[in-house]
Amino acid sequence: MDQWLEEIRAALPELVVYQQEPMKKHTTFRVGGPADLYVCPKKQELPVILGLAKKKGLAVTVIGNGSNLLVGDKGIRGLVIEVGAQMNAVEVQGNILRAQAGALLSQVAAKAAAAGLGGMEFAAGIPGSMGGAVTMNAGAYGGEMKDVIRQVTVLTPECEQKVLSREELDLSYRHSCIPKNHFLVLEAELSLTPAPEQEIRAKMAELREKRVEKQPLEYPSAGSTFKRPEGYFAGKLIMDAGLRGYAVGDAQVSEKHCGFVINRGNATAAEILQLMKDVQERVKKQSGVTLE
């Protein structure tokens, strides 16, 4: 690890490398132990960082905005790469919007609205970045990334850039081919639909109101904790199992929306995992449905 640090500092003297960085600072759950090494690189620095990590046998974990993510109390060994503020450029040409992987979905939706392009309204309130949204085919309120993606540029494990079409991405409910191939999203190209800016902003405001009304946005969480089982709603299954407000330490099933597990202040990853396990067991016993 020391040798990697030495070599990376020689190769990229401007790159800031944090050591023993608390991951709770970088997740929306506000939970997680320290990362051995932590960087937030520019796009052109990624191949150098990954190449050196591979050469030294250093484990690599890539994160985006830290939503939909639970980091253990002991943290993450090796190197954590945040695809974030150094990779968040967004540009519009005609009805095509290009966004780097670190661009926040709220930022992308706002840029699309300002250009009079509809299609990203559903994503305006999702607390994630473009890279994560593509990787898991993020969606809300009847929309998903699959509806708007034209193509995506990724970095392969061999540090080569590759362009994937929407078909090649194999997008389905909260799924893409990216994780199994160990690709790293660099940029997404979206095909959007011209619409009056006022209408787009009105739709975004309407969805924002729904979120504020129905979701526990006042507490740290990772968003919806469980996938929606086919034919059911996870939140209703949890509520029907009598688990509204159920808590383990400072981890709690939200009273506002049972599909969310929240951190009431000082929850640990162990408490959250135990809570999730308890919920899965109770729901399975009550309804026969397995929550993922």
Could you describe each region identified by the protein language model?
Residues 68-69, 109-112, 120-124, 137-144, ...:
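A generic local secondary-structure boundary/capping motif
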Residues 105, 109, 123, 127, ...:
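Hydrophobic, well-ordered secondary-structure segments
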Residues 2-130:
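Anion-binding (especially nucleotide phosphate/pyrophosphate-binding) glycine-rich loop
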